[in-house]
């Protein structure tokens, strides 16, 4: 269907571009004067078969228009050697081209490069591929002069394919080659991607551990400072959101951590107190955020009434209490507990003590075992540093 459509389009274009018959007469006479090709009549191509004229007509069209017509019709073009229409071969991309390098060194000289064996995990095929690549090239070394670059994957050494060979064996082959080394390398970005992926997983695991330690410290702080045992973990997310809102709105002049802000009531930074309402069992945390330098308030004026004779023996600290040392802003967060605030204080204290004694050890054991399981999926990290990276 596609070839028929293209033939019709070609005939229409020829009909519109053809001149008048008077102007076409000399061409026809010249065609009659030209000798006919010798040969049997059966050698002529049938009118319906695609030939050189058809391919010439197809090459006149723009490739984008031709591909669009093929996509709409669902047809394909007949293949022919030497045809101008070929699909791009992405397997021969520049980053997958191999190159052969010859390194020459002196008797008391090294080649000047370091190799490392890494494991690439293919999720689709559920397998791990061990790849040996160049991780470092020294300055003004035979390796740099030969054109070896960091990131080159070593495919063969002295004509020997090193696929599936262990790291130590590859090092022995290179050391036994003498002063002349012939390497076949393959450059690609898969090694760099694998390194970044492994580092990303490690940072995610570290962040998970630090976040767990941070929440554990917040639990201990609430228990030690306020005497509270909060079972709902969403309270810490609420406190974090309030703190971020205060920082974003500019209410807090300094970016202080949340731990010093929830200090003891007598500290210079600020204090915290717990208040319990009469009609509601919710818990209110009020945090006072003070400035960096405490500013003393002016003393209150003395009372106007006359003092009796017994007031002479009263200490001055009772009559004139000390002013507050800092000007502070307060932010209250209402966190309703699931079970109310009417529990026995002895049971709460016992539960908090058990959490403080057992929670940290269990949490550390869990994180350590999770990290050990994570390292099992990275074969390059399970081996020793001597086997993983070698200087040549």
Swiss-Prot record:
Residues 37-49 have a biased composition (Pro residues). Residues 180-257 are annotated as: Interaction with PSCD3. The modification Phosphothreonine is found at residue 76. It comes from the Eukaryota. It is found in: Cytoplasm, Perinuclear region; Cell membrane; Postsynaptic cell membrane. Highly expressed in brain, heart and lung, and to a lower extent in embryo, kidney and ovary. Gene3D superfamilies: 2.30.42.10. One of its GO terms (biological process) is intracellular protein transport. SUPFAM superfamilies: PDZ domain-like (SSF50156). The modification Omega-N-methylarginine is found at residue 269. It is a peripheral membrane protein. Keywords: Cell membrane, Cytoplasm, Membrane, Methylation, Phosphoprotein, Postsynaptic cell membrane, Synapse. InterPro entries: Intracell_Traff_Signaling_Reg (IPR052122), PDZ (IPR001478), PDZ_sf (IPR036034). Residues 1-50, 294-315 are annotated as: Disordered. Residues 100-189 form the PDZ domain. GO terms for cellular component: cytoplasm; glutamatergic synapse; nuclear envelope lumen; perinuclear region of cytoplasm; plasma membrane; postsynaptic density; postsynaptic membrane. The modification Phosphoserine is found at residues 93, 384. Heteromer. Composed of TAMALIN, CYTH2 and at least one GRM1. Also interacts with GRM2, GRM3 and GRM5. Interacts with CYTH3. Plays a role in intracellular trafficking and contributes to the macromolecular organization of group 1 metabotropic glutamate receptors (mGluRs) at synapses. This is General receptor for phosphoinositides 1-associated scaffold protein. It comes from Mus musculus (Mouse).
